[in-house]
Amino acid sequence: MPEMGALLLATQAMAAPGELLNLSLNASAVLPEGAVLLAMIATLLVDLAGEKVAARWVPPICYIGLGSALVLLALQWNAPLEPSFLGAFLADNLAVAFRAVIATSTLLSLLISWRYAEKSGTPVGEYAAILLAATLGAMLLCGATDLVSIFISLETLSVASYLLSGYMKRDARSSEAALKYLLVGSAAAAVFLYGASLLYGLSGSTSLEVIGVALQTSTTPIAALSLVFVLATVAFKIAAVPFHQWTPDVYEGSPTPVVAFLSVGSKAAGFALALRILVGCFGAFDDQWKLLFTVLAVLSMTLGNVVALAQTSMKRMLAYSSIGQAGFVMIGMVCGTEDGFAAMVLYMAAYLFMNLGAFACIILFSIRTGSDRISDYAGLYQKDPLITLGLSLCLLSLGGIPPMLGFFGKIYLFFAGWANHEYLLVVVGLITSVISIYYYISVIKMMVVKEPHEASDVVKNYPDVDWSLMGMQPLRVALIGCVGVTAIGGILSNPLFQWANEAVAETPLLQQAIALVGERGLG
């Protein structure tokens, strides 16, 4: 099969030079990213006018930019497929779905950031610009179909993430988190480059499509080695065991709004990359990479949820929880069926709201108390019923308790796994889900202790809520929105699953993989 970009140029050979350039670039495919880029530039320009001006104008600029990106993504849904930038980017439904998850995660992360930034003395303009840069890299990564565009997008996301992790310069934990993230991330980038060089040497091209065709006829040990290198990079981005060591320290030391974005936006980009490169390139090694992913999924679900039991920090507990959640999502990838891929997309959308809702509650609590310890939440319902209710619902959803949105997300994943005879993954998933429910409910039980004397000292001295302070209203909007979707979304899970199914059905890359699985099943 010829390369997409070359095929497009061949069919348009008689076009005028200007028209040919427009057709080969097809810049309309990246208009959502263009909106984010313009918002980032405008944010930097406004920041030059001073902190007071930035505090007033940066939030609406970010809202307009991200809102425009989401509208443009909606317009791209089911649009005719045309490769852009000579086949280096493809805005199929899969890319649109994951880019929408990332843009929404950034929007919600910004809503819960303003009060935190004001309280900690963080420059709003710089922070928002770096977060938008990370968003830009993550969104481009979802549609990248070329090794060069993948690496550029990956590094844009990574470098911005390093800066965000260490943005609290006066906090030693933040600097430590940034350094650890930088060192491990740089190693992962080097490993990916080495794997990419092997793929280029085997195929003579950087196009994923051409590489996939070349590997069909060249299942050499070098190709298998490149698979290991690429898989290691993907596992690092999604924080899968044993490439998870950076996650607890980075989550604990980084600013909480940054952790909220990394837990969803960066993870969504990682899974989009996994689908694009593993399914698109390594079809000839389908059994091998699925076996490796099965091992990673079992390890991630087990270690993530078991180690979370012993945590005393709320952010560190959610860090290990996110490792376990990555293992659940990997079940859909291992299945390789339409239901599996759709359940994977659905669960990422559900994880967006329930995880960011939990982080909104944690930020609201830490702003008032300065504490991150789980024990300090004891008796919180007496002083702050809103946080108690919101955090309880989000944690129950993360644990998979019906009728929350997270329950239906897990059920779809487990059904897809069982239908594809992935019994080990489903059984491990069910057992570790029960383990996760234990530590989630332990937090809830602590918050709703009945006797006033059992409340923590932090809660006893809990300050009154002042919603008139700068950044509090956006935080409340994000909190209520996330909790509302998490609680009510379970009832609306069928339309959400239809949306996820449509994302898979209209993506040729996934349909080819599904057909391959079907042929092997018949064989």
From Swiss-Prot:
GO-annotated cellular components: plasma membrane-derived thylakoid membrane
EC identifiers of the protein: 7.1.1.-
One term of GO molecular function: NADH dehydrogenase (ubiquinone) activity
Membrane spanning residue stretches: 29-49, 57-77, 94-114, 132-152, 182-202, 221-241, 255-275, 291-311, 317-337, 345-365, 389-409, 424-444, 477-497
Cellular compartments annotated: Cellular thylakoid membrane
A Pfam match: Proton_antipo_M
Membrane topology: Multi-pass membrane protein
InterPro entries on file: NADH-Q_OxRdtase_suN/2, ND/Mrp_TM
GO biological process: ATP synthesis coupled electron transport; photosynthesis, light reaction
Primary localisation category: membrane
HAMAP family listed in its UniProt record: NDH1_NuoN_1
Role noted for this protein: NDH-1 shuttles electrons from an unknown electron donor, via FMN and iron-sulfur (Fe-S) centers, to quinones in the respiratory and/or the photosynthetic chain. The immediate electron acceptor for the enzyme in this species is believed to be plastoquinone. Couples the redox reaction to proton translocation, and thus conserves the redox energy in a proton gradient. Cyanobacterial NDH-1 also plays a role in inorganic carbon-concentration.
Description of how the protein assembles with itself and partners: NDH-1 can be composed of about 15 different subunits; different subcomplexes with different compositions have been identified which probably have different functions.
Protein name: NAD(P)H-quinone oxidoreductase subunit 2
Organism: Synechococcus sp. (strain CC9902)
Gene name tied to this protein: ndhB
